[in-house]
A protein has these predicted regions:
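S4-like RNA-binding module at protein N-termini
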Residues: 1-7
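Long, charge-dense
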Residues: 81-89
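Non-DNA-binding regulatory cores of transcription-related proteins
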Residues: 7-72, 76-78
């Protein structure tokens, strides 16, 4: 699968972005959270310490002193168009 197709599939599986006490929760279509977590982890962004994924929910944990707005910017760089399609809660 091409990188562009992988990004499109990741974006289309994301249902919502929720800011939660310095972390970010991503709600997905059931069965997609883990693959999106792997995509984010493989992007290798320093600002993101790690991810934890279940079936339809993904938690992004930023490194110390990294703002959530910076995490959102990192996601937008890795998944262009994410915030336009999904928005934030």
């Amino acid at each position: 699968m091409s990188e562009t197709l992988a990004k499109f599939n990741a974006i289309s599986a994301i249902r919502s972005l929720i800011d939660a006490n310095g972390m970010l929760i991503i709600k997905t279509i059931p069965g997609h959270a883990n693959s999106i977590a792997v995509f984010i982890d493989n992007a290798g962004r320093y600002e993101i310490a790690g991810t934890i994924a279940g079936d339809d929910t993904l938690l992004i944990i930023p490194r110390d002193k990294i703002s959530l707005s910076h995490v959102h910017s990192c996601l937008e760089m890795s998944l262009p168009g994410l915030h336009k399609q999904v928005g934030r809660e």
